[in-house]
């Protein structure tokens, strides 16, 4: 069975589930060892699961079979949003340069080549994917060979580097090894992965020799479009509020866990959350309402993991809606509304406690209403971080009151990332955000 290394705020819940699904847990933290009574195993993982930057999900990376199996079991349990890269990290292929800074990868997809590399249009060479394509973003490939193993990575950069998870004391041992037993490989290009700190010199030397033989074989090339070596599969997994509640249940089977634990952990709560768990206090709604005061950051998370942050000040809290005032940077035009963003233009954002939408209404510096933008998303999570997953379709209303549906084609393009329950998003029409909350009447001005 596959070996999994799991880190982050979802570690206990996902470790419990992974064990149920037959995974072996490797390189566990001491806390996970204690909670599950595990025997420490420091062998390299087949899959690594770690926090996404938004703390509203995880990133999975590893051998494709292990990643696919983990995603399928996770899909069955929590029904999350899943975006899997269409190419692997360190896929090695024969690419044809088709334009300035672009190379054609297997399947015809185009990837960007960093400007520091000089490539001639029409030429072919061996390329390695260093940033896989995700959602609307192109991948990045370089005219280098990268051959990654469990412990090491051989490459053609001519440098020796180390995972940031290897401490300086351990780096000293590996640096000496790179200058002696691995000297020939280090002169080509060598990177020590985090698992290298647990490996013996003989294990490292054996893998380096195997990777070198594979690199020689790859360097012989092939016809354009050939995939010479499969890299690691990567996927972004995002949890909405419903999915987080399911993960709360999984964690509760191991240690005391209140409803809303993972949502609150994503707000940055530490020891005080441990206390609430121990006391068994059902305080999620009150806690997030308390946290949503003063300055907040709205995390607008795209299904493929892109995070757009909007900062503002809470001007009103009621039982069912939060009102945030956000200054806008001058310049440009409000999409779907047509009004110019002048100095002093601001938005009032209404965040309902339930309902799959957020309402952004826009005002001039003097408080004159300009129009409204309704974002359709998962149920928002309150707190000092207001978090939701964008479901890609939006509505806009100008001063004429005409409803304009935006980005419906984007939903169609990326619907496969969404679970079935989220593929037909709806939002009420005619909603406007004012300093007092949601209304359907056109305001003449606002003093917020």
UniProtKB/Swiss-Prot annotation:
InterPro entries: DUF402, FomD-like_sf, Ntdp-like, RNA-bd_FAU-1. One of its GO terms (biological process) is rRNA processing. Residues 426-448 are annotated as: Disordered. Residues 436-448 have a biased composition (Polar residues). Gene3D superfamilies: FomD-like (2.40.380.10). SUPFAM superfamilies: FomD-like (SSF159234). Keywords: Endonuclease, Hydrolase, Nuclease, RNA-binding, rRNA processing. Pfam families: DUF402. It comes from the Archaea. One of its GO terms (molecular function) is mRNA 3'-UTR AU-rich region binding. Its EC number is 3.1.26.-. Probable RNase involved in rRNA stability through maturation and/or degradation of precursor rRNAs. Binds to RNA in loop regions with AU-rich sequences. This is Probable ribonuclease FAU-1. It comes from Pyrobaculum islandicum (strain DSM 4184 / JCM 9189 / GEO3).
């Amino acid at each position: 069975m596959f070996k999994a290394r799991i880190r982050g705020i979802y570690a206990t819940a996902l470790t419990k589930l992974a064990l149920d699904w037959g995974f072996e847990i490797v390189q566990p933290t001491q806390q996970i060892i204690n909670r599950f009574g595990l025997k420490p195993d420091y062998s390299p993982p087949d899959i690594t699961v770690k926090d996404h930057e938004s703390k509203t999900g995880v990133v999975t990376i590893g051998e494709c079979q292990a990643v696919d199996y983990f995603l399928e079991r996770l899909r069955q349990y929590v029904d999350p949003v899943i975006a899997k890269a269409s190419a692997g990290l360190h896929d090695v292929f024969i690419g044809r340069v088709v334009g300035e800074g672009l190379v054609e990868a297997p399947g015809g997809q185009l990837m960007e080549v960093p400007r520091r590399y000089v490539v001639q249009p029409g030429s072919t060479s061996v390329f390695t994917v260093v940033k896989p394509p995700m959602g609307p973003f192109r991948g990045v490939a370089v005219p280098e060979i990268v051959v990654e193993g469990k412990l090491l990575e051989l490459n053609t950069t001519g440098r020796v580097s180390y995972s940031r998870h290897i401490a300086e004391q351990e780096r000293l041992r590996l640096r000496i090894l790179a200058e002696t037993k691995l000297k020939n490989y280090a002169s080509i290009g060598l990177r020590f992965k985090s698992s290298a700190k647990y490996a013996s010199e003989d294990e490292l030397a054996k893998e380096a020799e195997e990777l070198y033989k594979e690199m020689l074989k790859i360097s012989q090339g092939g016809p354009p479009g050939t995939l010479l070596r499969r890299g690691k599969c990567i996927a972004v997994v995002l949890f909405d509020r419903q999915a987080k509640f399911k993960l709360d249940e999984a964690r509760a089977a191991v240690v005391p866990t209140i409803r809303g634990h993972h949502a609150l952990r994503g707000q940055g709560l530490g020891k005080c959350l441990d206390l609430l768990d121990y006391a068994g206090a059902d305080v999620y709604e009150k806690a997030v309402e308390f946290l949503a005061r003063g300055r907040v950051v709205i995390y607008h998370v795209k299904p493929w993991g892109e995070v757009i942050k909007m900062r503002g000040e809470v001007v009103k809290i009621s039982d069912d809606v939060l009102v945030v005032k956000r200054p806008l940077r001058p310049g440009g035009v409000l999409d779907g509304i047509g009004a110019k963003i002048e100095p002093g233009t601001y938005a009032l954002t209404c965040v309902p406690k339930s309902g799959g939408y957020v309402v952004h209404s826009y005002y001039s510096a003097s408080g004159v209403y300009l129009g409204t933008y309704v974002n359709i998303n998962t149920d928002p999570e309150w707190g000092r971080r207001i978090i939701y997953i964008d479901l890609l379709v939006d509505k806009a209303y100008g001063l004429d009151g005409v409803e304009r549906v935006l980005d419906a084609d984007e939903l169609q393009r990326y619907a496969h990332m969404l679970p079935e329950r989220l593929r037909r998003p709806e939002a009420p029409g005619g909603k406007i955000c004012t300093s007092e909350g949601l209304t359907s009447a056109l305001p003449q001005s606002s003093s917020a």
